[in-house]
Amino acid sequence: MPKYRSATTTHGRNMAGARALWRATGMTDADFGKPIIAVVNSFTQFVPGHVHLRDLGKLVAEQIEAAGGVAKEFNTIAVDDGIAMGHGGMLYSLPSRELIADSVEYMVNAHCADAMVCISNCDKITPGMLMASLRLNIPVIFVSGGPMEAGKTKLSDQIIKLDLVDAMIQGADPKVSDSQSDQVERSACPTCGSCSGMFTANSMNCLTEALGLSQPGNGSLLATHSDRKQLFLNAGKRIVELTKRYYEQNDESALPRNIASKAAFENAMTLDIAMGGSTNTVLHLLAAAQEAEIDFTMSDIDKLSRKVPQLCKVAPSTQKYHMEDVHRAGGVIGILGELDRAGLLNRDVKNVLGLTLPQTLEQYDVMLTQDDAVKNMFRAGPAGIRTTQAFSQDCRWDTLDDDRANGCIRSLEHAYSKDGGLAVLYGNFAENGCIVKTAGVDDSILKFTGPAKVYESQDDAVEAILGGKVVAGDVVVIRYEGPKGGPGMQEMLYPTSFLKSMGLGKACALITDGRFSGGTSGLSIGHVSPEAASGGSIGLIEDGDLIAIDIPNRGIQLQVSDAELAARREAQEARGDKAWTPKNRERQISFALRAYASLATSADKGAVRDKSKLGG
């Protein structure tokens, strides 16, 4: 029978000092012996996805204490990728994932907590907490802050839905008036919550459902809706049950590594492909799998991408649907239901509620359930009122979207595409693969060949795009922006957005060893591995080289002979200490970022730290 970890600090005469300190936090004799559960919050006023979380930890804590546990809350950092975008701040985004994972480990292990409730939401916070949860392998439940309502505004006598990306594109489009740009900017992000499309934050919060570590509705129920409060209340109660099951009944099925098994990871990736999720999810799932010691690789993702269709299309791939529409159609469980009926899921998995996949679908799939309360929950909709407050409205759609032929979520027979929303490409400068969000690629450019325009920083590429130096037919290559080369693997949302602003969204390709925002669409190929800074062949591309992209056949090829590439590699190596570094880039790199870069692996490994360099 496992012993409560917290007993290390609460039992025995030699722990008198620790107990004295616990008493100073409000604990009493009656609490010594109860499970201590960490409420891992991520409130910050910097991030709209987290600005409403200040009091939500208290909600969870009250339920933990009522159920017989002791709740102790702490906070992690949270970087807003949208605010950090387009300048040096983006260098810090991906490295913050490792800091979050480490800080959770530090706090939980230093104080011997028995279990966790993770209150996450945005881009690197959910992955960081997920990595920590699987590393620690103690009972955990995720409950995120929820999606933002879609922005809405009237343009050309028509009400259109908006998000952050629309503000970026219009702001850079010289054809858009100042007044229209200002109107879109003021309307794009109306409420608290994670940005309203299927961007990285919402993609990851959906995937926690598929992994079994969060409750149904977690990924899609709006941050502003009063129904979301119940997820927090349930999490507080349920974590005590899971904790006691493990420590008092020796039930290891309560542990996250047994819930988020390889089968669950495959289900999560299947969901991701079907819903056209952010390419960043690939990076984060690979990293989380390593923490769980699960053999889940780019090869597994490639195999799944070849057989899973696209059953859901959401912004930025279309303006028609946002997360509020996904929820109305049944949310994550609605998509999983269609995938299950198509025979594409592993059914022998359980979630934190103790339900198998068939049981979860029977109870929560709007196409199957007889539970009116569940149907009512999925009718939770937007209010259209600007707010930073959680649970501030109770509006509902009149009906569910259960149209699986023409609605937001489709059945297999009516799939948006027989090919899924993500694909892995391989070729002579992406030997370990690269990723493209096919959900956002126009059919006319699924095959594309063009001359390379090579840039060694995102900044130079942006200057060239806005300066008219990139023209239709070009393949923009941005290198030395990988985990090590950046360092920090910046998102390339501004270059892709500005290509659209210049009318080149369907006329150019962009390839990088960096990554893309979940808000990116277009022929945007990222995560090229190995990255340039690790000796990857992307570092050998020269201006004018022809690059052929073939998404249907999963290929990407630099049309340069092997002999020429070998000569270029020899010349690169001859640069000595300067080999595999950018030639003409001035960038101030802090010690913290240099420390990150010294251990960073390429994207095909999840951009995690190279344990072999530490003897691990």
Swiss-Prot record:
GO terms for molecular function: 2 iron, 2 sulfur cluster binding; dihydroxy-acid dehydratase activity; magnesium ion binding. The active site is at 517 (proton acceptor). The modification N6-carboxylysine is found at residue 124. The keyword Lyase applies. Binds 1 [2Fe-2S] cluster per subunit. This cluster acts as a Lewis acid cofactor. Its EC number is 4.2.1.9. It holds the Pfam family ILV_EDD_C. It catalyses: (2R)-2,3-dihydroxy-3-methylbutanoate = 3-methyl-2-oxobutanoate + H2O; (2R,3R)-2,3-dihydroxy-3-methylpentanoate = (S)-3-methyl-2-oxopentanoate + H2O. Mg(2+) binds at residues 81, 123-124, 491. Its cofactor is [2Fe-2S] cluster; Mg(2+). One of its GO terms (biological process) is L-valine biosynthetic process. Keywords: 2Fe-2S, Amino-acid biosynthesis, Branched-chain amino acid biosynthesis, Iron, Iron-sulfur, Lyase, Magnesium, Metal-binding. Disulfide bonds: none annotated. This is Dihydroxy-acid dehydratase. It comes from Escherichia coli O157:H7.
